[in-house]
Amino acid sequence: MLAALVKVLNADTVVEIGTHTGAGCLALKAGQNPSGKIFTYDVISWDQLGVPSLLTTEHFDGGGIVQLIGDLSKDAFFEENLEKLNSADLIFMDAPKDGIFEYKMLDQLAKLENKKGRLLVIDDIRFVNMIDFWRQISSPKLDATGFGHWSGTGLVDLSDGLSFARP
C-alpha cells in the first residue's frame, strides 16, 4: 500500500518518521521515481539498532534515502528540518505508539505550510493506545486498514493543514 500511495501521489519527497529496520522506507522507495528522495528520521541510526536491518549502505549512497538522527517531536530538531518537512508530498508516521509521541508529532505537523495533495499516513491506528489518538484527528481522514497494515493504517489529508483535539 505504501508503494502504491507514493506512486499515485507522484511523491518526489517523502518523510518517514521512525526508520527502525527499514521495511517501511523500502516500501515507500519502491513506489517512488528514481530521482525521488526519502528523508527517514529516527533517534537511533539504522545500523546501530541491534537487530537485523533491511537497509544497506547502498540505499544511502546514491539510493535516494537520507537518514537523519534526532527526535522530531522536539522543537529545535523539528525547526532544523522544517524545509525538508515542508517539501514532503507524503509523511509516513510509524513511531513509538506510546500515546505521547504521536500527539507531540501532531503539534509539530500542524506547523507545516499547507500543501495541496500532502498526505499523512499513520501506522498502527488500531493498537489499543492509538484508537483515541486516531479519533482526535478532525482533518479529512480515512481508515484504510482493509488495504493496509493489519494493525491499522490511517490516511489524513494535510492539504489544508492539520486539525485535531487534545484529550
Please annotate each region the language model reported.
Residues 3-167:
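S-adenosylmethionine/decaboxylated-SAM
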